[in-house]
Curated annotation (Swiss-Prot):
This is Conotoxin Ec15a. InterPro entries: Conotoxin. It holds the Pfam family Conotoxin. The cysteine framework is XV (C-C-CC-C-C-C-C). The keyword Isomerase does not apply. Belongs to the conotoxin O2 superfamily. It comes from Conus emaciatus. Expressed by the venom duct. The modification Pyrrolidone carboxylic acid is found at residue 50. The keyword Disulfide bond applies. Residues 1-23 form the signal peptide. Disulfide bonds: none annotated. It comes from the Eukaryota.
Length: 86
């Protein structure tokens, strides 16, 4: 599985270099290629993002699944916690 991940990463970087190299004869900046490769590798290593479903406890909007927000149970003091809601 690791070899497949590395192979996909290398293919992605090579494809990016080829596509950028064809535009007006310019070569891509080395830093851009390295930064793109690092971001892609990090995303592959992390796997799919896990999100908090509706009505589950949360601390921040970033935890909630798409279309949901982390909101208080009771608005005045928010002592009882928050859940992901529409």
């Amino acid at each position: 599985m690791e070899k497949l991940t590395i192979l996909i990463l290398v293919a992605t970087v090579l494809l990016a270099i080829q596509v950028l190299g064809q535009g007006e004869g310019e070569k891509p900046p080395k830093e851009w290629v390295q930064q793109y490769a690092a971001k892609r590798l990090w995303a592959l290593m992390k796997g799919p993002r896990q999100c908090t479903p509706k009505d589950a406890p949360c601390d921040d909007n970033n935890q909630c699944c798409s279309g949901l927000e982390c909101k208080c149970f009771n608005m005045p003091d928010c002592q009882s916690g928050s859940t992901c809601r529409v």
